[in-house]
Amino acid sequence: MLDELDGAMIISKTLTKTDIVGNVALPKAQVMSVLTRMNGVTDEGLDNGFEVQVHDIMEDDLYTVTLKRIDDMKYYFGTGWSTMKHSLDLVEGDVLKLYWDQFENKFIVLNF
């Protein structure tokens, strides 16, 4: 399966202490690449925050997190991130890897 994934649809982030204790900041270039294949995303939606699904296929858990943009510069997961990070047992230094599945319209967790 991994050989078939489009690298432009992957968001990868080494988690910092700030990401663990608060909201996770996401790499701008990677998020912008994924946004090109997301349906129904608007500037207003990004500024206000919009819900996306994140599927942990190993545990068959589905999370809902809010993707938000600040000042056209920073992207992050807000609401829902806390539940997701605790369920995935993520700690500082871990690499969060997510793949945007444009056909299912959700992220797939690649941390396995």
UniProtKB/Swiss-Prot annotation:
| MF GO annotations | DNA binding
Q: Where in the cell is it found?
A: Nucleus
Gene3D superfamilies found in the cross-reference section: DNA-binding pseudobarrel domain (2.40.330.10)
- Kindly report the protein's main subcellular placement as a broad class: nucleus
Q: Sorted alphabetically, which keywords does the UniProt record give?
A: DNA-binding, Nucleus, Transcription, Transcription regulation
DNA-binding region located at which positions? 19-112
Q: What GO CC annotations are associated with the protein? A: nucleus
- Output the superkingdom of the source species: Eukaryota
Which InterPro entries does its entry note?
A: B3_DNA-bd, B3_domain, DNA-bd_pseudobarrel_sf
* PANTHER family for this protein: TF-B3 DOMAIN-CONTAINING PROTEIN (PTHR34269:SF15), TRANSCRIPTION FACTOR B3-DOMAIN FAMILY-RELATED (PTHR34269)
Protein's recorded name: B3 domain-containing protein At1g43171
The upper taxonomy is:
Eukaryota, Viridiplantae, Streptophyta, Embryophyta, Tracheophyta
